[in-house]
Amino acid sequence: MRKQTFKVRLLSLIALCGIVMAFASCSNEDVAQSTVDTNTENNSNLTSFVTGAAATRTSLNYDDGAFFWEAGDHIYVKDDNGTWNKSSNAPTEKTASFKFMVPGKYTNSTTYKVYYPGKNGLNNNVTISAAQSQAQPNSTTHIGEVGDCGTADATGGNGVFNFRLDHQAAILVFQPFTNNTGIKNCQLTKIEVTSDNDITGTYTLDTTTGELTGSASGKSITMTTKGSGSYANGFPLTNSAADLATNGAYVVIRPGTHALTVRYWIKDYATNVEGAITKTYPAFDYEKNDYYDMTANINVTDYDGRQYYQWDAQNNFWNGHEWDSADPWQPV
């Protein structure tokens, strides 16, 4: 297992948060997601939270650490009246920067907490899904839908606030490989991750620390690795070494110390035979804002009908009557 850090390089998202009121028009980055017109002077009730740095993103490119805002991403901010406000717009496509328009009044403080609860979150409530899915290898566009989240303290003054968004979940990056010819003919259909404690459920982003709090009961996550076209039956297992492009899969979990059992479900569609290969990992501290390489050599031992002997026997137990012989007695 190899730990990779999101800090600064990856998931510490730097953003410029400019508080601009009625006379600030939006740039071409603005993409309205509601009936609010974000390009007129009628927006006196909106504040602009502008993501300025190229590192301000929410989906992951593993190789170079590049992140991007994805379609449907929203941020939440609590205003001077203590009211939760969701950005009235969101990107409609993958983008490196974006200007979020947020309702509410933000003039009483030089610090405001910014929340990204994921695409399916609300305010500071986050759900890490027990059922996760990825449509193609080495894709992270799904992580915001299954529990990726983050918080930041926006600080500044005179209408300009800067913040660095820290992601509060941990991500497991599964990279199975095999040298077994039979397994190379199979497809990876799903990955089951089971913990000795909770790794999935509904949590709260603490309004002081920004970290995930609360106790959920979910101890198992199933990642389905199927999409369309060449991935309709699952991800290939043709690689003899770890290779993200072939079958890399990203699973979001609650950070913490977990002992994990991982079951790789594979299927040979030619014979319609399927099964699971199990790997265990001792207790380890999976920290927030980090991702972890979970490489695994998945293999099976092939016992043919001639490998069963009684003590000190000269011939195998089913000699002449193996399951694959002309006169089989051996059960299968």
Regions found by a protein language model. Name each.
Residues 2-332:
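Sec-type signal peptide cleavage vicinity
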